[in-house]
Amino acid sequence: MNYEEIVCDANNLYRAYKVSVKSSKWKESTQKFMMNFLRYIFEIQDDLMNRTLQNGPTQEFELHERGRIRPITSIQIRDRIVRHSLCDEVLLPEVRKHIIYDNCASIKGRGISQQRKRFEIHLHKYYQLYGNDGYILFGDFSKFYDNIIHEIAKRELLKLFDDNEFIDWILTLIFKGFQIDVSYMSDEEYATCMTDTFNKLEYRNIPKEKLIGEKWMEKSVNIGDQLSQVIGIYYPY
């Protein structure tokens, strides 16, 4: 099957549906979706095949995690199904071929326990060579997801698929949903917004009446979004 057939395959969409509702079955909206899931799955399949798919509405909230406040944008179940079918069946299998084995983030079957095992292995190897003479460097990229440039992320992903037309179309659609309304910016601020550091948490304090859709910034992805997790482990800049 080609990439379009893989993403649109009813069995793959069904698997994506099961993953998408797994942690939210207690929600009323999820329960309503589950009552008619077959009809919705085939509607999604039809929209994908006819290129009529549109991004659904989102909900914003904040997550307090390890002493940090993270701005989260939640998407509808329909959109989650599309993301999972695309990422789980097409993007991640290809991305895995191009990342180091010790990268355990967002990779099924690895995770924190696997990362701990690999960390211990590296510690033992280092001790055998150098004993206690050494140190560990711990780093973090501040506002990493907030400042991912769409053009670069999309270009690098498309390289893995020889600029496939279907992958190009669906990535373009999803990235359009990531765009940030920066109508509140002056012309001078807008001219440098792609290189200036963006802070989504501060952005949420901007009055809604200033966000009128006149200026859009093609930078930043949503934390927790399935595609964002793939981009996070492969984004080269």
PLM-predicted stretches and their roles:
Residues S20-Q31, E62-T73, I100-D102:
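Glycine-/proline-rich flexible loop or hinge segments
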Residues M1-D47:
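Non-catalytic, polymerase-adjacent accessory regions of viral genome-replication enzymes
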Residues R39-R68:
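Active-site-flanking structural segment that lines cofactor/substrate pockets
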Residues L129-Y237:
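Conserved polymerase palm-domain catalytic core
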Residues I69-I100, E214-Y237:
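Conserved pre-motif C helix in the palm subdomain of viral-like polymerases
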Residues V7-S24, N55-E60, C87-V95, Y127, ...:
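Short, compositionally biased low-complexity segments
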Residues Y3, E89-H150:
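Active-site-proximal segment of RNA-dependent polymerases
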